[in-house]
């Protein structure tokens, strides 16, 4: 039997079982757990390669073959780290397994035919597109920025650079919701809009959900009182939608205990649960210990560095319409930025007590940095805390990698009722797929696939004789244009909105998908991130303890996935 060295094999077909891959320039390594391909029967496209007529390509017609196959990719998802061929059919993931020609090859589960396109995944990491569940829709250019970073679903609220949107993630009222749904059809991005949830009576909230909101947002700038919390959650229970909350920093209408009591055990997504982005000072972080609370972070505090505190004070003054000449406004800002709780947030992510990471786009957050800041946090925690218990003795960081990737894929999908469509690499889901060269993992995708069509990619000079000459930068591809754009992305709304035929009312062309199971999801469902510690915060020193353990760490002075990759 002929043999090939591991190095030569990896260079040709990508890593296989037992091989380790470094994630960008971090201290994180993942190890291949399983290989669905068959040694000696791998398929690869190119001159003199396997996928040719009568060889790796069969005569099967399109009813038996996928539209696209991604060959020999290393899948990194919450459920595993495996090598496989991935098939896409009608915009969805149709199979994960072994591609080829069953007429001459054994073990084929994905038949390649003359109607099949090929994307080379050899040596690349394949992940699900990120879900950013904390978006201020301040400008449409955010969507392109997010897409080019690897985000394929954006959930939040807003109407553009209105003063309300600059501070809060709410799209208030039927007219605004309709306009945002109409505008959204121009983008290769799944979108969902949160209505304004701040009201003590249900009428206005019912209207917004029936008009196309996928959920509701409670924000302190609109008055997040116990009465509005209770009413909003009551409405959400009736419509099976999620509620996101930014709690009362000033403790004007109650303390964190009053807010938790107002939840009455009902599920809620707490934004920036550490508190720098807003929330009961100094102890909103306690909320992560509740079984009905789905806690997330926003990315400016990820991870804790020597620059974090200084940067936040300036951001806060702008985003919340504060005046540095008014002492009360300055005191408000100072109360929200606490190095002790930000440091604890790092550790709570590593323990799996904080379940999600999002951006808070242009409103104390960077829309294109959800992914890289998640992995920077994972790196910092490995350097400072060592291997997780689940990774001890394995020589790799597989469990930590699964924990962190879940924070921006499957967990926000579960939290907002969209996991039946997006959030993981699983058969039947939308083919929202990101490919990464390992050296650029989490920083610069090599290909962004949206609903089965290539929507964006780094591309060279269009007038060059080959695709690679400079200037190479991210450009929209065919999947981001025309009807293809509308047919490869979806808008998430409530079931009540679909029942009300808003597609006809607003003359929408792209598919509307109802969110579901929003009210039954709990912290226990947060994949690899379900820890519910007993939380304590010292009101004077701001020291944070989880199950009696003091949570503290030093700020990072240097991070990976940073200036090495970016000129600006």
Swiss-Prot record:
Post-translational modification: Carboxylation allows a single lysine to coordinate two nickel ions.
List of catalytic residues: 320
GO biological process: urea catabolic process
Stretch forming the signal peptide: none
Pathway the protein contributes to: Nitrogen metabolism; urea degradation; CO(2) and NH(3) from urea (urease route): step 1/1
Cofactor: Ni cation
KW Cytoplasm (keyword) present: yes
Textual note on the cofactor: Binds 2 nickel ions per subunit.
EC category name: hydrolase
Binding site for Ni(2+) 2: 217, 246, 272
HAMAP family attached to this UniProt entry: Urease_alpha
Subunit and interaction comment: Heterotrimer of UreA (gamma), UreB (beta) and UreC (alpha) subunits. Three heterotrimers associate to form the active enzyme.
Family of the protein in this entry: Belongs to the metallo-dependent hydrolases superfamily. Urease alpha subunit family.
Protein name listed in UniProt: Urease subunit alpha
Lineage: Bacteria, Pseudomonadati, Pseudomonadota, Gammaproteobacteria, Cellvibrionales
Protein encoded by which gene: ureC
């Amino acid at each position: 039997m002929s043999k090939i060295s591991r190095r030569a094999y990896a260079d040709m077909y990508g890593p296989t079982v037992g091989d380790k891959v470094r994630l960008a320039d971090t201290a994180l390594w993942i190890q291949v757990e399983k290989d669905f391909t068959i040694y000696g029967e791998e398929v690869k496209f190119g001159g003199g390669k396997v996928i040719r007529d009568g060889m790796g390509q069969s005569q099967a017609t399109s009813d038996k073959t996928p539209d696209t196959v991604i060959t020999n990719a290393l899948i990194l998802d919450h459920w595993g780290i495996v090598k496989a061929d991935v098939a896409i059919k009608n915009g969805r993931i149709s199979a994960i397994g072994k591609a080829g020609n069953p007429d001459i090859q054994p073990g084929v589960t994905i038949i390649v035919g003359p109607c099949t396109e090929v994307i080379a995944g050899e040596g690349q990491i394949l992940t699900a597109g990120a879900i950013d569940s904390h978006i201020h829709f301040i400008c449409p250019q955010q969507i392109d920025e997010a897409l080019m970073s690897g985000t394929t679903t954006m959930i939040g609220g807003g109407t553009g650079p209105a003063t309300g949107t600059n501070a809060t993630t709410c799209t208030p009222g039927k007219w605004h919701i309709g306009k945002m749904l109409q505008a959204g059809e121009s983008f290769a991005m799944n979108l969902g809009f949160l209505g304004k949830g701040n009201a003590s009576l249900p009428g206005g909230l019912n209207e917004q959900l029936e008009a196309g909101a996928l959920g509701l947002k409670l924000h302190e700038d609109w008055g997040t009182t116990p009465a509005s919390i209770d009413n909003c959650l009551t409405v959400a229970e009736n419509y099976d939608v999620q509620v996101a909350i930014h709690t009362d920093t000033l403790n004007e209408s109650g303390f964190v205990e009053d807010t938790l009591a107002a939840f009455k055990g009902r599920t809620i997504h707490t934004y920036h649960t550490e508190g720098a982005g807003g929330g009961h000072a100094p102890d909103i972080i306690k909320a992560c210990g509740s079984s009905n609370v789905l806690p997330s972070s926003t990315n400016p505090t990820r991870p804790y560095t020597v620059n974090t505190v200084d940067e936040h004070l300036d951001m806060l003054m702008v985003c919340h319409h504060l005046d540095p000449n008014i002492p009360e406004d300055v005191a408000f800002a100072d109360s929200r930025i606490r190095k002790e709780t930000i440091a604890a947030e790092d550790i709570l992510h590593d323990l799996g007590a904080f379940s999600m990471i999002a951006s808070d786009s242009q409103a104390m957050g960077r829309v294109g940095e959800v992914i890289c800041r998640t992995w920077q946090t994972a790196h910092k925690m490995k350097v400072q805390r060592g291997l997780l218990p689940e990774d001890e003795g394995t020589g790799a960081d597989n469990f930590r990698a699964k924990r962190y990737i879940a924070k921006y894929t499957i967990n926000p999908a579960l939290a907002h009722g969209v996991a039946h469509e997006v959030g993981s690499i699983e058969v039947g889901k939308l083919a929202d797929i990101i490919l990464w060269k390992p050296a650029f993992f989490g920083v610069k995708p090599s290909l962004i696939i949206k609903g089965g069509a290539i929507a964006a990619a780094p591309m060279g000079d269009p007038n060059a004789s080959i695709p690679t000459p400079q200037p190479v930068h991210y450009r929209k591809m065919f999947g981001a244009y025309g009807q293809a754009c509308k047919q490869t992305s979806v808008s998430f709304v409530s079931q009540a909105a679909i029942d009300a035929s808003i597609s006809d009312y607003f003359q929408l062309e792209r598919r509307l998908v109802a969110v579901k199971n929003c009210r039954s999801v709990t912290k226990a469902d947060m994949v690899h991130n379900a820890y519910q510690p007993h939380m304590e915060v010292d009101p004077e020193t701001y020291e944070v303890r989880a199950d009696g353990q003091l949570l503290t760490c030093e700020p990072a002075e240097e991070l990976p996935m940073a200036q090495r990759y970016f000129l600006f």
